[in-house]
Amino acid sequence: MEEDRLVFETSKGVEPIASFAEMGIKDDLLRGVYQYGFEKPSAIQQRAVLPIISGRDVIAQAQSGTGKTSMIALTVCQIVDTKSSEVQALILSPTRELAAQTEKVILAIGDYINVQAHACIGGKSVGEDIRKLEHGVQVVSGTPGRVCDMIKRRTLRTRGIKLLILDESDEMLSRGFKDQIYDVYRYLPPELQVVLISATLPNEILEITSKFMTDPVRILVKRDELTLEGIKQFFVAVEKEEWKFDTLCDLYDTLTITQAVIFCNTKRKVDWLTSKMRENNFTVSSMHGDMPQKERDAIMAEFRGGTTRVLITTDVWARGLDVQQVSLVINYDLPNNRELYIHRIGRSGRFGRKGVAINFVKSDDIKILRDIEQYYSTQIDEMPMNVADLI
């Protein structure tokens, strides 16, 4: 398998841009990005946004979990002209879920610029697609089969399309979409910008890039930016949900030795836990996606500056942030999917900080915990009594 993977280097001259504000994107789009909960661009966003919004063809080798979907959303929203109701950007994805997720992120990030996007996917009514497309959208995110069908019916008009994005291209090819991708491409205007994103680059992908692209910028983003190395991971078995709170109170003195982040799965749980901790005279701060950006910025600044030591939050925080001085993370709730686990407790290898993660686990969570262990080939042991000495 490995022989057909080329050694892939990032093109010379691709400089990472450390903040969204320096990317030259529209102010209202920047508002949408912050509102969505991003604070700092991920590695792929730092490298790919600028070449794409300046009109270059781009090949990005990146896996899921690198922030590629929001990178796509950001660039598409920057490029389209929302005053025109023509389709200007087309994104093809291998699965309905990914296409729908991409549409959601575009609508969320593009909220203040009033972008219109629609997911053209199998399993939804063709009538709905026709209605939406005739009403006018600037962006279509879809699966190759349905998009091809809509183009052939002349419902999806292609003359205004200036950007084609092929997401998870290797996955599209392995699902047998090659012919449909070529079919769609044939209908698109000749002056087309093409962006291809793929975790692997087999020869079939390189064939697409040589046929569809001119002098592409190459960007390689390894997912190993986040690592569990150097992080001691433990679990505490709690019989009932109510017992988690007592366990947390017992651990509070340990938490405040350093700074700690406590993750809950819902905003309601964050609010509930924060007020319950305060009722019991514990000092904590909290943050989640429903708070106004100003308030979130203030809370983050306090936490970064060390004025507050314990932060209770949802996954909004996990995705876009890198507070390296946090050496203790508590999963009050285990994350809903295993990718989020590394976003919550992983460290970027560059800093190589040591850390401790403690997972509160009810008996019905054991299976999820084992699944996480297996997925990351890591070991999560029962928490020892002297956990304070490890921090």
Curated annotation (Swiss-Prot):
Catalytic activity annotation: ATP + H2O = ADP + phosphate + H(+)
Motif DEAD box, residue numbers: 167-170
Taxonomic path: Eukaryota, Viridiplantae, Streptophyta, Embryophyta, Tracheophyta
Domain Helicase ATP-binding: 49-219
Enzyme Commission designation: 3.6.4.13
Molecular function terms, GO-annotated: ATP binding; ATP hydrolysis activity; RNA binding; RNA helicase activity; translation initiation factor activity
Function of the molecule: ATP-dependent RNA helicase which is a subunit of the eIF4F complex involved in cap recognition and is required for mRNA binding to ribosome. In the current model of translation initiation, eIF4A unwinds RNA secondary structures in the 5'-UTR of mRNAs which is necessary to allow efficient binding of the small ribosomal subunit, and subsequent scanning for the initiator codon.
Record Pfam families: DEAD, Helicase_C
Family: Belongs to the DEAD box helicase family. eIF4A subfamily.
Keyword annotations of the record: ATP-binding, Helicase, Hydrolase, Initiation factor, Nucleotide-binding, Protein biosynthesis, RNA-binding
CDD domains the record matches: DEADc_EIF4AIII_DDX48, SF2_C_DEAD
Protein name as it appears in the record: Eukaryotic initiation factor 4A-3
Gene3D superfamilies the UniProt entry points to: P-loop containing nucleotide triphosphate hydrolases
Subunit note: eIF4F is a multi-subunit complex, the composition of which varies with external and internal environmental conditions. It is composed of at least EIF4A, EIF4E and EIF4G.
Binding site for ATP: 62-69
Positions occupied by motif Q motif: 18-46
Naturally occurring in which organism (per UniProt): Nicotiana plumbaginifolia
Domain Helicase C-terminal: 230-391
